[in-house]
Amino acid sequence: MMIPIYIEEKKYMVEDTKNVLEVCLSLGFNVPYFCWHPALGSIGSCRQCAVKLYDNLHCVPDSKHINFGRLVMSCMTPVIKDMYISLFDKELQEFRKNILELLMVNHPHDCPVCEEGGNCHLQDMAVMVEHTYRRYRFTKRTHYNQYLGPFITHEMNRCITCYRCVRYYKDYAGGNDLGVFGVHDNIYFGRVQDGILQSEFSGNLVEICPTGVFTDKTQSKNYARKWDITFAPSICHQCSVGCNIILGERYGKLCRVENRYNSKVNGYFLCDRGRFGCNYIHIKNRPQKLLKKQNNCGYIEINAVDAVQDCVNILKSSNKIIGIGSTRASIESNFALRNLVGADNFYSGMSFFEQERLSLIFEILRNSGIYIPSVCDIENYDAILILGEDVTQTSARIALAIRQAVRSKSDHMAKYVGIYKWQSLAVTNFAQDAKYPLFITGIDKTKLDDIAMYTYYDSVQNQARFGFSIAYAVDNQVSFVKDFNLNGLDITKLDLVVEKLMCARKPLIVSGSNSGSKELIIAAVNIAYALKRKKSDVGLVLVDHDVNSIGLSMMTSKSVDDVFNTLSDTNNGNAVFNTVIILENDLYRHASVAKINKMLSNINYLIVLDHQYNIIQDKADLIFPVSSFAESDGTVINYEGRAQRFFKLYNPQNYDKNSDILESWKWLYLIHDTYVNCTRVKAVNIDYIIDSIACCFPELKKIKYASPKSNFRVHGQKLAQSTHRYSGRTSINANVNVHETSTPINDNTMFTFSMEGNSGNYSKKCSYNQIPFVWAPGWNSPQAWNKFQDQIGGNLYPSDPGVLLFDTGQENKCIDDNLYKSINWLKFASNSLNISKYTNKWIVAPYWHLFGSEETSQNVECIKNCMLNPYAMLNILDAKYINIQENMYIKFTCMDQVLCLPVKFSMDLPKKHIGLPMGFPGIPVFFSGMYVSNIEMMEAP
């Protein structure tokens, strides 16, 4: 309900559930604070956010009634109808200044050497309250700084005891290895002893901390102050969630990765893989030059004109041209390859089974009518079932949202007794450890088990059987698989799951492709369909593996196995010339060595475009070095069908005139235009490609609304990617040439690679939401996001970036069966899901890891430091049966590939399964669900 309040004698209508601090910030007032955070709520520990509250309107703050008001902490004070607040009272200003001086008693005077300088909330607040002189002249407290791992630097002496770090790490993220120790003015925030922080979300401490206690260790190698950095809005490419990030560069080196607020996706937080896993763009063995194979005896460098012409000559001499796309390449790059080779010759590059699962997920997104919630929507569900997907390792930001959904029961319980959600300590004390039900099925333990009501560990086949059982129990008219063998399943637990899902106001079903089972996906949809028939406001989340898995699935349904079959059929004794073009894809992750070698024997030319080195490049005839996501523009589509744009941070040619690196789509269009003798008046830009995509794929026509076009201007200006305080622009290249270089030109987007442009995006009348850097007058730190939102924690102005491509039935809460006539494909579910009875073979169970399973981030040095060594996981009973002890080595064969790995034991992994860390070097992702044979013990290599 909206109520009137008065701030500085002016009337405002505000929500009655908010606190005074939140209301003031939403209205654009500058109120200093430290301990409060929009995602964490209020505890009132810093005393910095004081305001003056008057009893009534007649007690205005003038000389006559100067003592009528009282100081209150705005973060702990709920708004009340007709309350009168002063923000600029003299007594109040003096109080704030004194509080900040007390907080600074033990804070070192090290701003010039602190890496938080220029991006520091403490600096902002000191300026805001006009604290300039410190009277404390005695010894300062000193602390021991801990080693917290390769991601975060610890400098405890800068702490002002706001308690934000432990409230986030323990209460919000569910970590248990960071705590608070000591009493009085000797408080310590850290671990019991030195060691790597175990939470997958520890990197958010860097932005949560208002001072420099926790800083980004990975930034130190290429450090630059915030005002000297060029920024660009981008999308994290490390999983299918598509979190919004801000990239920063100086001297052509990535020096900063920050969270970019989006109320529909990642909110205020990122996972550690997304925050720290981007530096692969500077890996030393990255392709940098155009290379051509010379008579099978090595490569020579060639120029761009010759490379394009050589490629065209190859294509013109070929009878068959095949293009293999990539789930880590943008929609535009994949389309450019498809445009070059033709729709019939364009393949996804995924294995047959992975392509089958993704095509199924795409069909569900397009036709099911079941609502697919965003990451932040997930936090509003009150019963969750996870089928076979270890989301902490495959889509960590979803796991963090699930934690908030489970713990939100406390908020709802407190609401009924008049306790507001932002009163975090009161909510915790009242509700204690109340949780909404979470049920998990999997092959082994997960990091979410600590908050689960029930966990079920078994093979993916039995997990699917369990899922179909739930669907049938919810509504026996819905499930197409009715004859279930429930041996080994706890019927009472099945009844518990069904009861909680049916009683829930908003149940959520989570599954995905990473389990390696299409039956699990079908079971998840059956459950969601059954619940929706019962008039439930159900949600369905189906996780994919890569950032653009859905986007590529919308363009083709042909897998890399179809490539092998096509080439085998094409050759078949005939003298034909075959050419394969591979776009940003390591085929050895998706197909066996034998199949790839056979493909190579059936082709005459291999052309590779990539920004990462992989073994397939050693077989290539031409290698085109292409831009990484930080050096290019493009669109990707996340798991919910949300199209999001990422923007070029810098042009490699700006720092190296001899660089051959171009965007994939730019190389492919150069080749295409030369191949078809097309002369363009104007070079192809990304707007042209997006318009072409919209014409070819009606389901992708909305991607043009994911971002303004390149001709977008604000007051006739492009948007600046650097702050107006950017220094040294004219001297960056002075060591190479004393003559000042011209400002780089960006023709593809509405941004400019400089400070010269519009940077007034902090205005709430702003007409764009693609924010290159977060800054507002007086707000230099990430806390400045409050200046870009319609209300605290709300949408960005004018709306959040990105556009949903599918109408997933959010409003269809009461449906009839006619809506589902288009999803008869659910009927292909197998009536019997039998476990293999082979006694001499083992099924590969996929173990995914946040650090190591993703193709590109595993090349980053700090990620390598957190990766486990490759291993083989066995059930402890199986190990005893074959007389294997832990840490011994076993040798086995999978898909004609011989592996030798140390053994680990699990109590929960199903029998006759061998768990392998998917995606690790030497363990391709297509191993999931395959058979292992010839296990034998051996000495450690």
From Swiss-Prot:
Subunit details: Composed of 13 different subunits. Subunits NuoCD, E, F, and G constitute the peripheral sector of the complex.
Protein name per the record: NADH-quinone oxidoreductase subunit G
Cofactor-binding details, from the entry: Binds 1 [2Fe-2S] cluster per subunit. Binds 3 [4Fe-4S] clusters per subunit.
Required co-factors: [2Fe-2S] cluster; [4Fe-4S] cluster
Catalytic activity: a quinone + NADH + 5 H(+)(in) = a quinol + NAD(+) + 4 H(+)(out)
SUPFAM superfamilies recorded: 2Fe-2S ferredoxin-like, 4Fe-4S ferredoxins, Formate dehydrogenase/DMSO reductase, domains 1-3
Binding-site list for [4Fe-4S] cluster 3: 236, 239, 243, 271
